C-alpha cells in the first residue's frame, strides 16, 4: 500500500482531558465525522481521509482513552464515550455531519443519530454493533466452513467478559492489540503500520479502555443499559430517512454479507457495497474502495441538496 499523506494530529480540550483528532479538507465543505472502534484510533482512517477530503471537511477523533487522546480516570463505559464525543462535537462547533463509522464507532453513531436526527446528513457504516439477543448472534455466520471460527471468537469474548480472565488476556497479555486486531485484517500489517496501534497501550493500566469495550457489547440483554440504549438507537435507525451506505466484507466478522444484505434492505435509502475479502477492520484491507465510495456518495447527495431545499 502506498505511503499515506500525513495529516497533522490536533488536540481539543474536552471535559478536563483532551481528545486528539485528524482534520483535513475545506473548512466550508460539509463535515464528515469518522468514528473508529476498539482498539484502534483515527490511524485506521489514514488512507481514507485523503480520498474524502476533496468533497468534505473531514474530522476523525481518537476516542477518549484511545490513540493520542487523554486517559482520564473513568470507567470507559459506552456512555462515557457518548459524553466525551458529544463534548468534542460541541467544542469543534460541528452542527451537522455525515457519519462514517466502524465497530464501536457505529454504536456511537447510531446513538447520536437517534438523539439528534437533524444533525445527521448521512451515515456510512460497516461491521456494526447491534443488540444481540443470544451469543449465537455474535459472529453469526450462515456458512458451514466458518462455524468453528465463529465459535472460537465467541469463546474468546466470553473470556474477555469474565472477571480475572479478561484482565489477564487484555491488560497483561495485550491480546486485543496483538491478536484480535491483526486477526481481523486479511493482509499482514508491517511494524510501521502497527506502531500507532501499539503505542497508546504500553502498560496494563493503559489498556483499561480496551478491556472495557468487550464488556459493553450488548449480548443476551447485558449490560442492560447499553442493550436498551442500542435497541432504541436501532429502532430510530430503522425509522430514519437520511441516506445510508453499508459496507460488507467476505466473510466479515460481526456482520456477514448475507446479514448485511438483509439489513440494508430493511432500511430506507440504504445502499450496500460488497468489498470482497474482508474480516472486521475493513478499512485496513479496502481503504481505497471505502474512501472513493464515501466521497462519491457524499458528492451525489450534496449535488441534489440545493434542489431539495428549493
From Swiss-Prot:
Domain AB hydrolase-1: 30-140
Pfam families: Abhydrolase_1
Catalytic activity: 1-haloalkane + H2O = a halide anion + a primary alcohol + H(+)
Keywords for the protein's UniProt record, in alphabetical order: Hydrolase
Annotated active site: 103, 127, 280
EC identifiers of the protein: 3.8.1.5
InterPro entries: AB_hydrolase_1, AB_hydrolase_fold, AB_hydrolase_sf, Epox_hydrolase-like, Haloalkane_dehalogenase_2
GO molecular function, one term: identical protein binding
Summary of subunit composition and partner proteins: Monomer.
Function: Catalyzes hydrolytic cleavage of carbon-halogen bonds in halogenated aliphatic compounds, leading to the formation of the corresponding primary alcohols, halide ions and protons.
Family membership: Belongs to the haloalkane dehalogenase family. Type 2 subfamily.
Protein name per UniProt: Haloalkane dehalogenase
Lineage: Bacteria, Pseudomonadati, Pseudomonadota, Alphaproteobacteria, Hyphomicrobiales
Gene: dhaA
